Amino acid sequence: MSKFVFVTGGVVSSVGKGITVASLGNILKSRGLSVSVQKLDPYLNVDPGTMSPYQHGEVFVTQDGAETDLDLGSYERFIDIELTADSTVTSGQVYSEVINKERRGDYLGGTIQVVPHVTQEIKARIQRLADRSKADVVIVEVGGTVGDIEGQPFLEAIRQMRNDMGRDNVIYIHVTLLPYIQSTQELKTKPTQHSVNELRRIGIQPDIIVCRADYPISEGIRDKLSLFCDVERKAVIFMPTVSTIYEVPLKLESEGVGDLLVSRLHLNASPSDLSIWRGLVEKIKEPTPAVRIALVGKYVELKDAYYSVRESLCHAAIHNGRDIQIDWVYAEDIEKNGPEEYLKHVQGIIIPGGFGIRGIEGMITAVKYARENGIPYLGLCLGMQVMVIEFARHVLQSDKAHSTEFEPDSPYPVIDLLPEQRGVDSKGGTMRLGNYPCVIQPGTMAGQAYGNKLINERHRHRFEFNNDYRDTLSKAGMVFSGLSPDGKLVEICEVSGHPFMVGSQFHPEFLSRPNRPHPLFREFINAAKKVIRDGEQPSLPLSP
């Protein structure tokens, strides 16, 4: 039977629950335990697939095609596992299912209430993940902050889980912020005390409190929180701000979190072995020259919109013995001012995914700059599509080339709607989503990067390369180096004779790991580090 770790957050949002949960999974896995993770999101959207990147940040896609919170990407990267749709639960999903059951008559005419019907549905989804994953430990993060109205049913559900599963099988961890008052130069514990009191009113007594702070925490604060929050002194965990998020598992382990979890849950675990992870962190902290990459995007004001891309660049830089400097370039600025001002100093250009026509011409201009100046280029999803459009416009001199996403009546639609998408009006969960196989052509940049003939990558798109133009572009120097097994869909294209110019219709950033960078990102940074523009770049911190 699985054991359960429930993680809540207090005082403020964005306190670091997601990284804490990912780090707990890392620690438990280092002790030979199998781990699965789940995120409970209280918002009423069914999933974040139709949410604005400015509202939600990145949409992370699982292997089976679920559109999820970016925290699931952190879980996968830290624990090195692949999650499924069972790992994401939203209020929208829960309430939709409860209402559907009521309409079918499943409740036999009963009055439908938050307790017990909504809470039972939440608990059923938690238990479903445990049953299907058969993990030794299931870690469940409750999104939002204690006190949020929409989070109340989820907190009530996890409160009930301890009675349902037994006290030795459930543990509660509360992640909270200790704010620093500059005028008095002290950390304050009162917000944490109030947050814990709110949890206790609901019926949840935290077993462990993880205290986030930007300044050193004294032992006196540990004593105070232990007294007022009724938590053992050794279970008050200090988590200071660190230079790289990948150091968090080491900090938590040094605070004794792993031993606490094993003891409280009576786990049959091996001794902790974080030696490989420790070596990774040491490598990250080594001062090395930086490689400077321009990320040209639509949503660069909110960097979390490209969270997995950013982390994948960091992973590739680690592997190549470099730090990373990312220039966040707004595509519309290139449209207004031209590319030179933004791209003249960079050693590589990457264009990630996105939707809509805004900024497209700026992206096409950036691709042209990379192609003509021999600057390594990596295009992801939309980034591949604008690469094809640019090639058709400026190499084939077909200035009307476009995507039907942006110009439905284009006379030269090199990018077109997938056949199965025609007639689909609903936006939510209807794209080509999740893992699909791809056959790599030997003797290509992609072939050199992967070293395998058959790969599986994650997708999230409606539009695809138009095969009517495959022969024409191929004769002009575009190489179609990755195809679907039936040869009908172009998955990877590249420009022959260029140091590195590769576009993928899929999202390779979802499969990169800190100790195993994705092959396309690895080779992109390898090519970029060889480019010298205005001398070597200064060493910069790895985590942006």
From Swiss-Prot:
Where does the chain bind ATP? S14, V15, G16, K17, G18, I19, D71
Q: Tell me the residue numbers annotated for binding CTP.
A: S13, D148, I149, E150, K188, T189, K190, P191, T192, Q193, K224
Question: Which Pfam family, any one of them, does this sequence belong to?
Answer: CTP_synth_N
Q: Which segments carry the region annotation Amidoligase domain?
A: 1-267
- Reaction catalyzed: UTP + L-glutamine + ATP + H2O = CTP + L-glutamate + ADP + phosphate + 2 H(+); L-glutamine + H2O = L-glutamate + NH4(+); UTP + NH4(+) + ATP = CTP + ADP + phosphate + 2 H(+)
Note how its activity is modulated.
Allosterically activated by GTP, when glutamine is the substrate; GTP has no effect on the reaction when ammonia is the substrate. The allosteric effector GTP functions by stabilizing the protein conformation that binds the tetrahedral intermediate(s) formed during glutamine hydrolysis. Inhibited by the product CTP, via allosteric rather than competitive inhibition.
Q: Which GO terms describe its cellular component?
A: cytosol
Q: Name its pathway.
A: Pyrimidine metabolism; CTP biosynthesis via de novo pathway; CTP from UDP: step 2/2
**Active site, renumbered:** C381, H507, E509
Superkingdom classification of source: Bacteria
Record-stated family:
Belongs to the CTP synthase family.
Q: How does it assemble?
A: Homotetramer.
Instruction: Report further notes.
Output: CTPSs have evolved a hybrid strategy for distinguishing between UTP and CTP. The overlapping regions of the product feedback inhibitory and substrate sites recognize a common feature in both compounds, the triphosphate moiety. To differentiate isosteric substrate and product pyrimidine rings, an additional pocket far from the expected kinase/ligase catalytic site, specifically recognizes the cytosine and ribose portions of the product inhibitor.
> What's the protein name?
CTP synthase
